Design a protein with these regions (language model features):
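Basic, Lys/Arg-enriched alpha-helical interface segments
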Residues: 1-65
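Enriched for short, Lys/Arg-rich terminal
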Residues: 70-104
Length: 104
């Protein structure tokens, strides 16, 4: 089985931190569990990342965009060679990314 290196981008880590802080304001213990689970979800992409579906945003991007669902959040990522680049962590209720908003 091929093992992929997993590289979260700065933007994805900032998204994760922002979500953590939002959850923490309401439920600190839940936020800690959520963040630990998110990191486990990141790591899981090292094995068979193509098991994840194409994201709805995929047709609008040059590179293939896939998603891993984690609770109410979507982990958006792309594959390049044997590396998984985690691009964003977005709440499922948020508008879909466009090439313009993907870097916000």
């Amino acid at each position: 089985m091929t093992v992929y290196r997993v590289e979260p981008t700065h933007r994805a880590l900032a998204d994760a931190d922002e979500a953590f802080l939002w959850i923490y304001d309401e439920a600190p213990e839940s936020a800690l569990r959520w963040y630990d689970g998110l990191l486990d979800a990141f790591k899981s992409l090292g094995k068979n990342p193509t098991r994840c579906s194409l994201a709805q945003e995929n047709p609008f991007f040059e590179n293939e965009i896939r998603q891993l669902l984690y609770g109410r959040y979507r982990i958006l990522f792309t594959l390049r060679g044997k590396t998984v680049y985690i691009l964003r962590v977005r709440h499922g209720a948020r508008e879909h990314l466009t090439p313009e908003t993907s870097k916000e």
